[in-house]
Regions:
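N-terminal helix-turn-helix DNA-binding core of bacterial DNA-binding proteins
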Residues: 10-48, 108, 126, 169-210
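Short, hydrophobic-biased segments on the C-terminal half of alpha helices
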Residues: 56-57, 215-216
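Basic, amphipathic "hinge/linker" alpha-helix immediately C-terminal to the N-terminal HTH DNA-binding motif
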Residues: 20, 71-91, 232-251
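Short, structured motif recognition centered on aromatic/hydrophobic residues
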Residues: 23-26, 65, 87-98, 110-112, ...
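Short, Lys/Arg-enriched N-terminal segment that forms or immediately precedes the first helix
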Residues: 1-16, 152-175
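C-terminal regulatory/oligomerization modules of transcriptional regulators
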Residues: 99-163, 263-303
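Catalytic cores of eukaryotic secretory-pathway lumenal/extracellular enzymes that build
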Residues: 57, 66, 98-101, 261-262
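Beta-hairpin "wing" of winged helix-turn-helix
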Residues: 60-74, 221-233
C-alpha cells in the first residue's frame, strides 16, 4: 500500500506541473472560451512563442488537447480531448475566483450565461454522493498525516519551471497566484491547518526568503492575514481570509481531475465529505438551476 500511495503522490505532482502551471491555466481558460489557434492563444495571453509552444506540447502529450491539421497547410488547431473536457469545472471555478479576487484596475472578466436556465453562470461545488454544497469545514482527511505527506512530496519534487511571474494586463490573478508552486502549496498547508512560519518552512522545505515573499504576496492580495502570537521575538500566525478559503474547491477540482485520469490503480481517496461520510467527489453545478454545465451551454454574454 505504501508503494501505491507513493505512486499517487507522484501522479499529483506530475499532474499539477502540467495543468497547474500559470501559463497552462491561461491556455485552458482561453481554450474553453473558444480559442484553438496558436496565434489566438498568443494574442490573448501574451505568452511568448517559445513558451506557448512548450506548454501546448505538454498539454497534447498529457492527453488534455489534441492537434487537428487544417487542410493541406502545416497549421493546426488545438481541441480538447475527452479527458481535457474534464477540466471544465475547474476552469469555471477559476473564472469565478477571478471575479471574486478582482481588484480596482484589473480588466473586466467576461460575463457568462448558462443557456439552460438563461441566468448568469455562477458555479457551485456539491458532493457527488449527497448533493450538498461543499464547504471547507466539512472536508476531512481520513488521516491528517496523509495530507501532510502529500504536501511534503509536492514541495520536494516537481518541475522547477513553476515560479512566480509578474501580473500583466493579459494575465489572470488566479493564474499568477495559484500558478506558482510555492503559493499553491502554502494555500494547501493552510487548508490542513498550518498557521506558523516555522511549520510552513518545515512542511514545505521552502527557503525562508521565498516563504516570506509568498506570504507577503498572499497578504497583499487579501487571501491571508496575520496576527502576533509572540512579541519577543515577533512571531505571527497566518490564516486564510474568506477570499483565501474561496480557492479550496478549485484546488480540489485540479487534484480530483488528476487522480481520476490516472490509469494505474491508486489507493482510495483520503479526503472525506463529513456530512455523508463518503470519499470526497466534487461536482460543479449551476448555482441557479443546479444542473451540471457543459461547455456548449456556458457562453459569453454579448452586449
Amino acid at each position: 500500500m505504501e508503494n501505491a500511495y507513493a505512486a499517487m503522490l507522484r501522479t499529483i505532482v506530475q499532474g499539477l506541473d502540467v495543468v497547474g502551471d500559470r501559463w497552462a491555466l491561461l491556455i485552458l481558460r482561453e481554450a474553453f472560451y473558444g480559442c484553438n489557434r496558436f496565434e489566438q492563444f498568443r494574442q490573448n495571453t501574451g505568452i511568448s512563442r517559445a513558451t506557448l509552444t512548450r506548454r501546448l506540447n505538454d498539454l497534447v502529450d498529457n492527453d488534455v488537447l489534441y492537434k487537428r491539421p487544417l487542410g493541406s497547410s502545416k497549421r493546426v488547431e488545438y481541441n480538447f480531448t475527452a479527458r481535457g473536457l474534464g477540466l471544465f469545472g475547474a476552469s469555471l471555478l477559476a473564472q469565478d475566483l477571478e471575479n471574486q479576487w478582482r481588484e480596482k484596475g484589473d480588466p473586466e472578466s467576461p460575463v457568462t450565461v448558462h443557456t439552460v436556465c438563461q441566468q448568469p453562470f455562477k458555479p457551485k461545488a456539491v458532493c457527488r454522493h449527497c448533493r450538498m454544497e461543499l464547504k471547507p469545514e466539512d472536508i476531512q482527511w481520513q488521516r491528517i498525516e496523509s495530507g501532510y505527506s502529500e504536501l511534503i512530496e509536492l514541495g520536494n519534487t516537481g518541475n522547477s519551471r513553476r515560479t512566480r511571474d509578474s501580473h500583466s494586463s493579459k494575465s489572470s490573478r488566479v493564474a499568477s497566484l495559484i500558478g506558482d508552486r510555492w503559493t499553491l502549496l502554502i494555500l494547501i498547508a493552510c487548508f490542513l491547518g498550518t498557521t506558523r512560519f516555522d511549520d510552513f518552512s518545515q512542511q514545505l522545505n521552502i527557503a525562508p526568503g521565498i516563504l516570506t515573499e509568498r506570504l507577503k504576496s498572499l497578504m497583499s492580495a487579501g487571501l491571508m492575514t496575520r496576527e502576533t502570537y509572540s512579541s519577543n521575538p515577533p512571531r505571527y500566525e497566518y490564516t486564510l481570509t474568506p477570499k483565501g478559503h474561496a480557492s479550496y474547491t478549485f484546488v480540489i477540482a485540479l487534484r480530483q481531475w488528476i487522480l481520476e485520469g490516472c490509469r494505474d490503480e491508486l489507493p482510495a481517496a483520503n479526503m472525506i465529505h463529513g456530512p455523508c461520510g463518503q470519499p470526497l467527489k466534487q461536482e460543479i453545478v449551476c448555482g441557479h438551476c443546479e444542473q451540471k454545465p457543459w461547455p456548449r451551454d456556458v457562453v459569453i454574454k454579448n452586449d
